[in-house]
């Protein structure tokens, strides 16, 4: 009989949860209908999403800056600047090389996507 009481308790809890869920759904539906009738309650500010060309332009500028910095370090090392050591020059040169290679790969992918779109049948 003890097990039966436990089952009844569980069933009553399930019923209570179901009625609570139904009430919450009704409240949400009422609020959504009220929102459609009254209009939006708050005005959401639109976030400016950068365009692809802006992002690509920033990437190109970033690569240019990295290459300029590597060139300046290389020149300073060649001139005998004691504050510039060979490790900094080599690391800057590798960063420059990697960033330029990444930019080249992005360009290749964009060109390939453009060609795929142009070859699509209408």
Curated annotation (Swiss-Prot):
Record-level Gene Ontology MF annotations: cytoskeletal motor activity; structural molecule activity
Protein origin, superkingdom: Bacteria
Biological process terms in GO annotation: bacterial-type flagellum-dependent cell motility
A family per Pfam: FliE
GO cellular component: bacterial-type flagellum basal body
InterPro entries membership: FliE (IPR001624)
UniProt keyword annotations, A-Z: Bacterial flagellum
Subcellular location: Bacterial flagellum basal body
UniProt family annotation: Belongs to the FliE family.
Name under which the protein is recorded: Flagellar hook-basal body complex protein FliE
